[in-house]
Amino acid sequence: MESLGYETVAEEQVRPLIGPSLAVLFSELADCASDEGILRLVDKFRERYGSIGYSENRLYEGMPEVLTELSANGYLLGVCTGKRVDFAVRILEMFGLSDLFEFVSGGDVDIDKKMQIATLISNGLDATTAVMIGDRAVDVHAAHTHGIASTGVLWGFGDRAEIKESAPNHVATRPWELLELFRDPVE
């Protein structure tokens, strides 16, 4: 933000805004009323994210093993993220997880989670058997909108109050709890 003349903000201000689109994040953080200014901030963020920001991601302890077991048990895994698809794929590849996922759906400035899920459903996703697993209320709300079950997780960027308030079908406090929720292999 500083490189475009905006005041730098503390991580504590950014963290609660992670999840919705970058346009929402920057409209909240920057004193900028114009769409053009927001788009410049988004472009600058993506420039840095594409060069090094993606590599700053970290895996949560136990997630690779949980994902591997879910996949081995016949669950079809997908990613529905606010990140652009190319960034999400690069992150999955960086961690050696890309082969576990059937699809990656990415967001954009004008594409939110609800729109992403609507597109996935129109492309054949069965909402009656799908489960959205997410760390933010926006994930749970998007699932509710489309009649998809949801599991809120308490690791990541959301917190207990936010997740509980969004009313997911289940709440997991640790990654391996997902294996308890989805213990039966898919036939």
Question: What does each model-identified segment do?
Answer:
Residues 21-35, 91-92, 119-122:
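Helix-loop "lid/cap" segments that line or gate small-molecule binding pockets
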Residues 98-112:
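A short, structured active-site edge motif that brings together acidic residues
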Residues 51-79, 85-89:
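Short, acidic loop-to-helix structural element flanking the phosphoryl-transfer center
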Residues 1-16, 30-35:
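Active-site neighborhood of HAD-like aspartate-dependent phosphohydrolases
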Residues 132-171:
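Acidic, Mg2+-coordinating phosphoryl-transfer loop and its flanking beta/alpha structural elements
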Residues 105, 170-174:
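Short acidic-hydrophobic, aromatic-tinged amphipathic segments that line or gate anion-handling sites
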Residues 113-141:
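Conserved Lys-Pro-Asp/Glu-containing loop-to-beta segment of HAD-superfamily phosphomonoesterases
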Residues 7, 97-102, 126-127, 169:
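Conserved H-loop
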